Each structure stands twice: as structure tokens, then as C-alpha cells.
Regions:
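N-terminal binding-site loop/beta-alpha segment at the start of enzyme catalytic domains
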Residues: 1-72, 89-90, 102
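Glycine/small-residue-rich loop that forms an oxyanion/phosphate-binding "nest" at active or ligand-binding sites
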Residues: 85-99, 105-108, 113-128
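Residue-level detector of conserved catalytic or cofactor/ligand-binding positions
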Residues: 132-145
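Catalytic beta/alpha-barrel core
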Residues: 48-50, 107-108, 142
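A short, structured active-site edge motif that brings together acidic residues
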Residues: 70-82, 103-112
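Hydrophobic pocket-lining residues within nucleotide cofactor-binding pockets
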Residues: 26, 78, 137
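Feature marks short, surface-exposed loop/turn motifs that line or immediately flank catalytic pockets
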Residues: 25-27, 52, 82, 110-116
Length: 145
């Protein structure tokens, strides 16, 4: 059995392919071809990020690869500068629009780095609630975190 057909099972029961196409350093103009070639080879896990600047091309590749969308595990990442729930949620909606997709299987916080005010805040409880909130599916079920 090829590693391309092997999966890990996440704690929530969702299966993620063990091997995925990482698209860092793939230009947006080349991303669709790269995704289509990877899917033709057997890849079913495609990874991009807002910071890579290639979500449009990756989405095009996903939409035009010839494999049904529900058979692909598509992941993107919220850019590190989005520090609030509102900003992160807006950026996820923008990602879906750029990619031309209705949903992503996983959205990751890319390189979560604290900011200078993190320990200065009087509102850490409320800020912490945003992490709990984004761990639930978005109210439109257009993406899952």
C-alpha cells in the first residue's frame, strides 16, 4: 500500500492523508498546475496558507483536478498577524473567496506568535474565549477550524 493512500485519524474521527502537497514557494501562477499534477499522482491532501500568496491558484487546481472535492483534504492557514477572532474569521472568509471553495477541511493558525500586549491585557478571559469559539464549526458551516 502506497503512503499516498494511508491516513492518520484525528481525535475528532476525521481522517487526514499522511502525505500532503505543501505549496510554500509555489507561485500563484503555477499553483493550479502543481495541484493538478499532485492529485493525478495520488495526493489527496493539499496545504496552502494566506502568507504563501497562492491560494487563488491552489483553489483553481482543487476545482479543476478531476477528483471530487469531498475526496480532497484541503488545508490553509490564518496569517499570524490576525490576532482577534473577528480578524481571523474575516480572513478565513477571504481565503474561501480567493480559493473559490465552499469549505476547507482544516484551517490552522499559522505560526501563532504572541504580541507585546498579551500579558498586559485586562481582558485575557474574553480573549481566551475566542479560541474556544473558533474551535467550533463556523455558523455557516463554510469552514471548520
Amino acid at each position: 500500500m502506497s503512503v499516498l493512500s494511508k491516513n492518520y485519524t484525528l481525535n475528532n474521527g476525521v481522517e487526514i492523508p499522511k502525505l500532503g502537497l505543501g505549496t510554500w514557494f509555489i507561485d500563484d501562477a503555477d499553483a493550479a498546475d502543481a495541484v493538478r499534477a499532485a492529485v493525478a499522482t495520488g495526493y489527496r491532501h493539499i496545504d496552502t496558507a494566506q502568507a504563501y500568496g497562492n491560494e487563488r491558484g491552489v483553489g483553481e487546481g482543487v476545482r479543476t483536478c478531476g477528483v471530487p472535492r469531498e475526496q480532497l483534504f484541503v488545508v490553509s492557514k490564518v496569517a499570524a498577524e490576525h490576532k482577534t477572532y473577528e480578524s481571523a474569521a474575516k480572513s478565513i472568509d477571504e481565503t474561501l473567496e480567493k480559493m473559490g471553495l465552499d469549505y476547507l477541511v482544516m484551517m490552522i493558525i499559522h505560526s501563532p506568535q504572541p504580541w507585546g500586549e498579551v500579558n498586559q491585557s485586562e481582558n485575557r478571559y474574553v480573549e481566551g474565549l475566542s479560541l474556544i469559539h473558533i474551535s467550533e464549526p463556523h455558523e455557516t458551516d463554510s469552514y471548520l477550524v
